[in-house]
């Protein structure tokens, strides 16, 4: 949903799903904002005049803080605003469109510069374009700044990690004869046009920046947080990602099995991932990372990293780094290293005509670099080393096995070790063991760290999309959330039809209901839209009950003087309106249903004097489709006489009106045979009665 103000009438009447809202001067801006937010159209247009613009501005402020984008636009921008999804930074007047119409121009857009130095352009019928962070400025004016952030990065990453599974599917096989990159890209673009843009992924790139900046302990970081981690590399923070495989954890046996992973060169991707893994590993030591790279060429990703890290390079080919030594690294250079990280990615160009001899030389070279790594770590400056290894029988430190995909899978992997690791017992590994690991395990996260334990102080903690994981006990997660005082945490919402459902997407997650928690009253429980509003953003995408929704738990977010500022009733009735105006026996079904359950006999004034609260009923009965409204917080504040709102339309509900609404929601679920909904209504009633 988006709300657009226009001083001039534009050519907008031909757009589907657009509603022209007439500002009612008889109502306050609160009432107008509420009526606007509950329109079922996705685009609401308001024609402005000097007589109403000040009141409209107040309504727009209220809508934006509730995560519903509302802004005055130029007439010549009506097209993109009505046809594109976007994330709006309403505090700074910046609009981030997530717009793929560049497909019309046969463009393929990436946000990592090193892709330009591959042969991708030879494999695709598209023009390959690079934009830093994927950001293309479309307009820069006094009213606002417009960017487009949509890219094809996700298609590249799916190709690298998931192409075998995707191209083995029946749908792909029916459409294409060949399993190649060109067809893969075409297929992924078809899926994008058929279903939806990856809105959450694109929007989160924008909105997670503020939550990251405010936090010092990050739980569950993954690669999508790389930009924020880089932007905050000089501030104090650590991460707990429960990620990383130790050498001693490897099992099984295998043999050499060369495989081409990609039609185009992804060696630079692998090197970039390796480098970031090392840098963020050192960052977790509470040190400012820096790096010496031995064997750096061509290093097409290094120039963009110089702004974040000091990077010293050694290679006989020229590399654009902070300081480049145009020669090979020698043993005499060991004592000259002053960076706290060293990345060794060297393999001499041995004669390939005699593979046995070459194999012997590769193993000897590997041992030599391992010894150099020990000497570097025994010195004063170096904290961690990431070095190239090969599958062989050898005794090595029990470090981390790092294996990001590269163009060809052969015999190589990487070993991450630090000062403490090399002091511990070494591990004997066999060639067979390492081949099995190389053939079956691929790294997919640059953040390596231990597991976070759900105890201790929570100040400064941000935990997005991870604490629901079944590695944590569900009751412990609830206890943790009830005392949580960090920036924000999330748990997966149960919008299935199975009580205590465990959802398996990328990981196994427990599911929760807002009624599971007993948080302080200044903590807001809301949806992604509500979370966006709290952190200064608004989003156009409507919530979908797709099994991948999270409850955002945000401490100290409540506006104690005005409940409506964040996670309020704005938009609460949209789903109800849609159902009543398209499916039910009468548009008054909501009023009639609640009064019938409440035992009201005279229905004459049911739409004006209902026995049950419509707000409370809608918040419970339709939570799957919009749980932005913090109903649990509202119930607690309301009953304790602590509820405050700056509104001329609010009327305090009686206990009977609230109780009747909860009972009506329970009956609604009962008639649907919905056990989860019944459980939710039952828990909500317990919360209310406990307050009584």
UniProtKB/Swiss-Prot annotation:
GO terms for molecular function: GTP binding; mRNA 5'-cap (guanine-N7-)-methyltransferase activity; mRNA guanylyltransferase activity; RNA binding. Transmembrane segments: none annotated. It is found in: Virion. Residues 256-432 are annotated as: 2'-O-methyltransferase activity. Multifunctional enzyme involved in mRNA capping. Catalyzes the formation of the 5' cap structure on the viral plus-strand transcripts. Specifically binds to GTP and displays guanylyltransferase and methyltransferase activities. Has affinity for ssRNA but not for dsRNA. Capping activity is non-specific and caps RNAs that initiate with either a G or an A residue. Together with VP1 polymerase, forms a VP1-VP3 complex positioned near the channels situated at each of the five-fold vertices of the core. Its EC number is 2.7.7.50, 2.1.1.56. It is an enzyme of class 2 (transferase). Belongs to the rotavirus VP3 family. One of its GO terms (biological process) is viral process. It catalyses: a 5'-end diphospho-ribonucleoside in mRNA + GTP + H(+) = a 5'-end (5'-triphosphoguanosine)-ribonucleoside in mRNA + diphosphate; a 5'-end (5'-triphosphoguanosine)-ribonucleoside in mRNA + S-adenosyl-L-methionine = a 5'-end (N(7)-methyl 5'-triphosphoguanosine)-ribonucleoside in mRNA + S-adenosyl-L-homocysteine. Residues 187-255, 433-558 are annotated as: N7-methyltransferase activity. Pfam families: Rotavirus_VP3. This is Protein VP3. GO terms for cellular component: viral nucleocapsid. Residues 559-692 are annotated as: GTase/RTPase activity.
